Amino acid sequence: MQAVFLARSRMLFLTSDGKPPARFSFYVASKEGTTGRNQVRRRVSRMNITFLLNGETVELSDVDPTATLLDWLREDRGLTGTKEGCNEGDCGACTVMVTDEGGAKALNSCILFLPQLHGKAVRTVEGASGPNGEAHPAQQAMVDLHGSQCGFCTPGFVMSMVASHTNGATDHDTQLAGNLCRCTGYAPIIRAAKAAEEHPVPVWVKDKPVAPQATSSMLPGSSDELAAVYAKRPDATLVAGATDVGLWVTKQLRDLDPVIFLNRCDDLKEIAITDDEIRFGAMVDMNRMGGALAGLHPSYAEMIRRYASVQVRHAATVGGNIANGSPIGDNPPALIALGATLHLRKGDARRSIPLEDFFIDYGKQDRAPGEFVEAVSFPRQTDRLKTYKLSKRFDQDISAVCGCFYITVSDGTVTQARIAFGGMAAIPKRATNVEAALIGKPWTHETIQAALPSFAKDFTPLTDMRASATYRLETAKAMLERYFLEDQGETTNVLEVSA
C-alpha cells in the first residue's frame, strides 16, 4: 500500500499502486505533496503573472489558473501562517490583505486563484510585522488583550484587522464578521481591534500594486478584449470574484479549462449615477455597490452589508451574482424590485432585457454561448424600496427568504407595485399576483390582508435545510405586512434577544 496525498483536496488515500483513485484521475501527486494535475494534459489557460508578496516582486510562469493563493502560499512558499479552515470562504482563517488600485482589502485566500493577483500586492500574516520584527499594532493588541487562545483563527483575525486598520475602518463588528473563533467569545478580539486604532499605520504595510503588461488573452484588459476572446472560446469559464466558482474547485473538485479572468477589465468596474439612471458595471464588487447605494436606497445597502463577510463582498461582483442564476441570491430580487435592466454583450453585439426575464429556470438563464453580463441599470427614483433578509445567522448567511418591495402610493391609492423574492422559487421571481391584488386599491391594512392569499398563486416554495415551505410562505406574507406598517410609521424593528 502506498499513500497518495492530493494537496488541492487535502485528501490522503491508501492505494495499492500509488496512483490517485479514478475519481481524481486529473491529479498527479508529486514527492513534495503538491498537485501536478497539469501534467495530465496541456491546459489552454496557463499564463504568466506578476504581483508583490510581502513587499517583494513575484513572477510566476505557466501558472495553473485554478491554483489557489492559499495552496501556493503554504505548499510552494512555505508561508504556513495562513490557515485553511473551511476552504470555502466562510471562516476567515485564510484571510490575507490584497492591495490594488481600489486600496487595501481583506480577502479569503482559499478561494482566490493566482491569476486574480496579477498586478496586485499581497500581504500575509508573516508580512504584517516589520522588517526588524516590529509587531503590527493589530498583532501587539491581540497579545496584550488576550485575543488568542487555541490560535488557529488568529492569523486570519490579525489580517482582517491589518486591512481595516490600513483603511481606517472602525466598524469592527462588521469588519470581523467573516472571521470565526470558537474560543474567545470575540470580546477580547474586538477590544484588540479598538486598541489598534490608537496607533498609526506602519509604513511597511502601505503596499502599492504593480503595473505589469498583459501576459495572456485569458487575462483580458478591457471588455472589448473580453468580448473578442470569449467569442473565440465560448466554452470558457468566466471568473470574476471566484466566490462561487472557487467552490467548484475546492469543494466539487472540478477541473476548469479554459478559464477567462475578468479582474483586469477596469471598464466593467465603473459606477455611473445620473439624474435619471444608476448603472453598475458587471465587475463592481458588492462593497462598492453598497457604498454607492447608501444614500440612495439605504435598506438595500444594509442588506448588502449582511449579504456576506467583508472578505466575500470585496470579491463578489454584481455581474457574477446575477449570472450564476442562484434562486437564493440576495441581489437579483432587489434589482428586480427596482425595475432593473440587464445589459449583455457577445462580440460587438449588445442587447438589453428586463432583469427578471434573464432567469428562465433553475440553472438556466437567457445567455447565449460567448455572451456575458456587461452591466445592470435601473431608474433613479424616489426611495420606496425595502429589503428584508431572513436567515439563521444575522451576518454572512444564505437567506431562507429575501423579500424586496417597491410600492408607490398616490392620494392613498397604490399606483405601482414591484415585489420580488429569493428563496421562494427555482429562480429570483416577481410576485405578480400579489402586485395585481394591490395596484389600484386603497393603501390600507384591509387591502394588505386581501392580497395575502395571492402569495400561494405566485409561489410554491420548497422545504429544505433552511426553512419549510410553510414557513417561507408565511414569512413572505409577513414581510408585506411589515412593509405596510413601516410605511405607516409603525416600529417593527427586530429585537436581539440574548440567550
Task: Give residue spans per PLM region.
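C-terminal structural segment of proteins
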Residues: 57, 97-98, 102, 106-109, ...
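Short, Lys/Arg-enriched N-terminal segments with co-localized hydrophobic residues
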Residues: 27, 31-46
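Immediate flanking context of iron-sulfur cluster ligation sites
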Residues: 71-92, 127-152, 165-182, 309-315
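Short, contiguous acidic and Ser/Thr-rich linear segments
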Residues: 58-64
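Acidic (E/D-rich), amphipathic helical modules within compact regulatory domains
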Residues: 86, 90-95, 103-114
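Eukaryote-biased recognition of intrinsically disordered, low-complexity regulatory segments
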Residues: 47-56
